[in-house]
């Protein structure tokens, strides 16, 4: 009989077991108890992925034990973020109590409704279209176990915010759910997408619950002053950050054409490359040209709108989107290329009317073919930006690039796609939350003892650099780990 080895975390510690190939994790736990005489405690009920009771951590990700097939060397642990009662059983009572405080039922301002008023409450399918998208939750709590904002701040978690959204979107409910959402720290969510990634019912909590609820919350006047400052920036200069020096778009030419062209792209710069990280933008041009890619740079492009979509300010984001669509839809290029994870995710997922293809710069480089790079004898680790890894499903390309540089040693950190804490308006709106989440990321980076931290997102660059600096001082460490954009790295070896 062919077997796999799995490790189960019991109350007294980890223990390894041999189990037959082909079982689910739930089957394997039952097999272990029966075959080895163990008494591992775990929850289960329907065994069909409908009750949500069997969720556990499998290789550091929350999944349903009844729907996950055993693989060799899997590690099974109780859900993170909850007190453990015994073995794989966690205490769910705090969650249920919190749900109770959120008035988890439709409420009317006036319980006594006249027949005339009742007649006016007729609903049609379109009235509940937003509710339908988020009501399939089975309370497995997988999203809560993975949520960085819930772990490191006073944020109730994705599914509780989903519940508030469910009632806020229901015309029958008349309570001020937006005020409840604001009081429950809806702006603590980094929109990292971990909850979406692990949801067994594939509920898009980020886009269909949190961001839509933030839009309603903002319209009711429940907002953060710092988010309004970002709003002022874009209204005055079409960028989300203040201008500090000559912009990238002012410094460069309209186009950089190469002979024997493999591909022609339009460069969407984003706010940080244009106003803060001009040298990375110039590196991008050189790197693309070196790979046989011609670069067109539209000078009248504006902010992609991501900071405003994420924080509920959709009146601003729609205006910005319209301007960019008018510019980029007219271009005769193979693709629009982005150097920012947030910009790329926004263009790919939120620009529904686009007539152009969008690619991250690492996707472009791998597609046209990597070239022979000069050797570079350094050790690096890599951070997956949330809006690249989960927002665009791009994670192999950066690794292919790093592994193609001679003498460069690439090592993975513990959880490379763990959120750094900067996204979703959290760095500007809730800096203390961003700092708390960033501290864990810094710990993972320092544990690798790498010479450099490499990433692809300018926003992540800024925040991780700040997190590492604070971590260095807090722990009295002498070794600094600089943060470098993968394009800056390539500019050194082309």
Swiss-Prot record:
Keywords: 2Fe-2S, 4Fe-4S, Iron, Iron-sulfur, Metal-binding, Repeat
Positions of [4Fe-4S] cluster 1 binding: 137, 140, 143, 199
Record-annotated 4Fe-4S ferredoxin-type domain positions: 127-157, 178-208
Pfam families named among the record's database cross-references: CCG, Fer2_3, Fer4_8
Domain of life the protein comes from: Archaea
CDD domains: fer2
Keyword ATP-binding part of the UniProt annotation: no
Residues that hold [4Fe-4S] cluster 2 according to the record: 147, 189, 192, 195
Gene3D superfamilies: 3.10.20.30, Alpha-helical ferredoxin (1.10.1060.10)
Membership in a protein family: Belongs to the succinate dehydrogenase/fumarate reductase iron-sulfur protein family.
NCBIfam families assigned to the protein according to its UniProt record, in alphabetical order: dhsB (TIGR00384), PRK06259.1 (NF004898)
Full protein name: Uncharacterized iron-sulfur protein MMP1067
Protein source organism: Methanococcus maripaludis (strain DSM 14266 / JCM 13030 / NBRC 101832 / S2 / LL)
């Amino acid at each position: 009989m062919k077997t796999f080895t799995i490790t189960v975390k019991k109350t007294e510690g980890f223990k390894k077991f041999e189990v037959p190939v082909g079982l689910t994790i739930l089957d394997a736990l039952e097999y272990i108890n029966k075959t080895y005489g163990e008494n591992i405690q775990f929850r289960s009920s329907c065994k069909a992925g409908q009750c949500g009771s069997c969720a556990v951590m499998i290789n550091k990700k929350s999944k349903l034990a009844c729907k996950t097939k055993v693989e060799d060397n899997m590690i099974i642990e109780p859900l993170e973020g909850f007190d453990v009662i015994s073995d794989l059983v966690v205490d769910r009572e705090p969650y249920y109590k919190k749900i109770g405080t959120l008035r988890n039922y439709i409420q009317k301002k006036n319980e006594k409704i006249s027949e005339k008023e009742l007649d006016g409450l007729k609903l049609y399918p379109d009235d509940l279209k937003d509710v339908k998208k988020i009501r399939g939750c089975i309370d497995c709590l997988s999203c809560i176990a993975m949520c960085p904002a819930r772990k490191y701040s006073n944020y109730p978690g994705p599914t509780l915010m989903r519940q508030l959204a469910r009632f806020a979107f229901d015309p029958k409910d008349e309570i001020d759910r937006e005020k409840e959402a604001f009081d429950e720290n809806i702006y603590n969510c980094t929109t990292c997408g971990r909850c979406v990634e692990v949801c067994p019912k594939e509920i898009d909590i980020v886009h269909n619950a949190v961001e839509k609820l933030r839009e309603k919350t903002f319209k009711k006047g429940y907002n953060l002053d710092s988010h309004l400052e970002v709003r002022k920036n874009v209204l005055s200069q079409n960028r989300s950050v203040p201008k500090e020096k000559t912009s990238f778009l002012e410094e460069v030419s309209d186009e950089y054409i190469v002979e024997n062209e493999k591909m022609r792209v339009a460069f969407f710069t984003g706010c940080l490359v244009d106003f803060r990280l001009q040298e990375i933008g110039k590196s991008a041009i050189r790197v693309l040209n070196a790979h046989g890619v011609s670069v067109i740079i539209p000078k009248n492009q504006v902010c992609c709108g991501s900071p405003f979509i994420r924080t509920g300010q959709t009146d601003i984001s729609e205006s910005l989107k319209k301007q960019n669509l008018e510019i980029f839809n007219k271009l005769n290029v193979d693709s629009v290329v982005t150097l920012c994870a947030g910009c790329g995710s926004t263009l790919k997922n939120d620009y529904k009317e686009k007539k152009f293809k969008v690619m991250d710069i690492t996707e472009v480089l791998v597609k046209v073919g990597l070239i022979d790079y000069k050797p570079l004898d350094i050790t690096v680790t890599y951070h997956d930006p949330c809006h690249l890894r989960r927002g665009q499903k791009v994670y192999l390309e950066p690794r292919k690039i790093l592994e193609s540089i001679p003498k460069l040693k690439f090592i993975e950190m513990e959880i490379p796609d763990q959120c750094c804490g900067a996204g979703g308006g959290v760095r500007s709106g809730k800096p203390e939350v961003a700092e708390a989440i960033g501290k864990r990321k810094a710990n993972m980076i320092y544990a690798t003892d790498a010479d450099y931290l490499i990433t692809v997102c300018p926003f992540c660059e800024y925040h991780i650099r700040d997190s590492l600096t604070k971590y260095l001082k807090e722990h009295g460490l002498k070794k600094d780990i600089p943060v470098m954009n993968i394009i800056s790295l390539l500019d050194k070896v082309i």
